[in-house]
Every structure is written in structure tokens, then in C-alpha cells.
Amino acid sequence: MQKKSIELKSNNFTLLVLYLNNQNIDLINQSLYKKIQECPKFFKNAPIIVNVSKLCNTVDWKKIKKIIISHGFFVVGVSGCQDGILKKNIIDSGLPILSERKNNKSNIITNFFINSYKNKKKETINKVEKTHIIDIPVRSGQKIYAKHADLIVINNVSAGAELVADGNIHVYGIVRGRVLAGANGDTSRKIFCTGLFAELVSISGEYWLSDQIPSEFIGKSAQIYLKNKFLTINSLS
């Protein structure tokens, strides 16, 4: 039997979702710039969905779209749009309106929010003061951030959950969510886990999605770190 030339199938992809919680275009531009500076390699050329549920129809959508694209993102669609006029403006700009499912948290890498732009003192990259220990399961939709600290999880991490630490991350259990170590830019940090099924792993902005993790390490004990600016993975056994 001859194989079909093309096939259309449903699938799940892990994408960034950008929530616009403010109508001020200059503020959005400043906040995007600031966010990208935190992890420029992580966000570079990233495909994203833009959530506009907080925007009204008077906003200059074409300008917002232009600003987002100017920061290096690829907008694949728009979600959360309930206003007819805004919806028409979005469609006229060449972007599709996407419907959201109730369990869409499992398909989000990280939600980053545009609320307000606040100047903060630059933090020392290698400043790790303490260790956070979590001994209960980390559920889908939960996000744990260990600021200036290592993070140790002595339990399982569900799909759709997110672990973030400025230091190292240790997971003594099965990890199916997202794991981001060295979040403040420290390239010496590592990820250790005993059951690797992660949706995403990242060290200082360098990341692998689940399908980029070498298959021989899936479900195994592993350590992940940066070597010559590239992600490297080794067995712990």
C-alpha cells in the first residue's frame, strides 16, 4: 500500500504563553526587554502564544505584535480573546485565535507576566545562600522558585509543574515537569534526578525540551550540566 503524502494529526507541543496584563505599550516593551535579559538564550527565537484576556479593543494590537516580534519571539497564535473587535484586529494581522483547554497548564513552559516594570539592583550571579527542601509531591500547575538557593525535592514532580532555582536542583523521585537551574545566569549549576521524564530541562537559559533529551537517559538517573556552553548529560549510576 502506498504511503500517504501527507497526514494531519492532533498533537501536543510545549509553548511559552505570554500574558499581557497591562495596556501600556511602552511598559510592555520595557518589561519584555527586562524579562529577556534574565535568560536571553532561553527566549531567543522562542515560539509563543500571546494571551490577551486582559486587553480591551482600544489597544493598538498591530503595535503590540510588532514589539513582541522585535524582541525575537515568533507569535504562533493568540488566546484568551473574548472581544469581537479585538478578535477581528488580531485575525486581520494574520494570527489565529486559539481556544484554551482547561488542562492547558501541562502544555506551558513558563508563564511570564507583564504587570509592572520595577528597577532592581543587579544580583550577584553565584550567590547561593541556603537550600530549600520539599518532601511532598509537586503537582501540575505548581511552581517552586528557590531564590539564591539550591532546591531539593524528595518526591515526584508531575507534568505541568515547574522547579526553578538560582542554584542546583536535586529531584529524588520521578520528574515529569520543567526543571530550570542556574536561573540567575550561573552556568556552574547542575540538575540531578533519579527518574528523568522532564518536559524541559534548563541550565542558565540553555534548555532541552523533552524530545531533545537523549532517549537513553529517559526514565534513568542522570545529571545535567553545561560544558563549553552546551548542555551535557551523564548517568548517575
Swiss-Prot record:
InterPro entries in the cross-refs: CAP/MinC_C, MinC, MinC_C_sf, MinC_N, Septum_form_inhib_MinC_C
Pfam families per the UniProt record, alphabetical: MinC_C (PF03775), MinC_N (PF05209)
UniProt entry keywords in alphabetical sequence: Cell cycle, Cell division, Septation
GO biological processes: cell morphogenesis; division septum assembly; regulation of cell division; regulation of cell septum assembly
Keyword field contains Metal-binding: no
Family: Belongs to the MinC family.
HAMAP family noted in UniProt: MinC
Annotated PANTHER family: SEPTUM SITE-DETERMINING PROTEIN MINC
Job of this protein: Cell division inhibitor that blocks the formation of polar Z ring septums. Rapidly oscillates between the poles of the cell to destabilize FtsZ filaments that have formed before they mature into polar Z rings. Prevents FtsZ polymerization.
Assembly behavior: Interacts with MinD and FtsZ.
Official protein name in the record: Probable septum site-determining protein MinC
Provenance organism: Buchnera aphidicola subsp. Acyrthosiphon pisum (strain APS)
Gene name of the record: minC
